[in-house]
């Protein structure tokens, strides 16, 4: 995944500097043009969660982090795996290292994100690795509705969760 993220640094006027992992957001129809960044900071000193968000000015309604590991153009993809975060996508790959197209919505999936990628990948199977909670189940239902409206067969859109009691793929990797 080394080609699919960078470090972003923010220098504030009060002299503080923050560095985050930044995952470029693109539009599926123009995957070479960055339209924002999904950002993740370091955990705090007390071990609690770090910063999670999007860079100012990001196109969050349509932009997706797309890590196409297949070597083929996006419109030729046969399998696409969706996640709520790039961390979950990379965690799933650590558990199941298969070269597919990995996608993060950077939070709650939007209809614009769904329609954008579905329109470019009409022959692909979509595996929905959203969190195993009420919100994640709703995201799967929303995705299936949009995909059906666009003519996708039900069996081409599948929920894809880690085995066991894990909430998400990162928790599965870390055995939390």
Placement of each model-derived feature along the sequence:
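Short, basic/aromatic recognition patches
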Residues: 1-16
């Amino acid at each position: 995944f080394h080609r699919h993220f960078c470090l972003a640094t923010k220098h504030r006027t009060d002299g503080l500097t923050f560095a985050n992992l930044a995952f470029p957001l693109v539009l599926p129809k123009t995957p070479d043009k960055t339209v924002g960044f999904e950002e993740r900071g370091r955990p705090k000193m007390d071990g609690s969660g770090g910063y999670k968000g999007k860079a100012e000015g990001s196109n969050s309604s349509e932009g997706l982090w797309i890590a196409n590991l297949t070597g083929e153009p996006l419109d030729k993809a046969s399998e696409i795996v969706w996640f709520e975060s790039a961390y979950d996508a990379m965690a799933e790959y650590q558990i199941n290292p298969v070269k597919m197209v990995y996608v993060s919505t950077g939070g709650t999936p939007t209809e614009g994100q769904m329609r954008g990628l579905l329109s470019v990948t009409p022959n692909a199977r979509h595996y929905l690795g959203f969190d195993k909670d009420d919100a994640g189940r709703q995201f799967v239902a929303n995705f299936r509705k949009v995909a059906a409206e666009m003519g996708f067969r039900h069996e081409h859109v599948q929920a894809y969760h880690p085995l066991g009691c894990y909430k998400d793929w990162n928790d599965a990797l870390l055995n939390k």
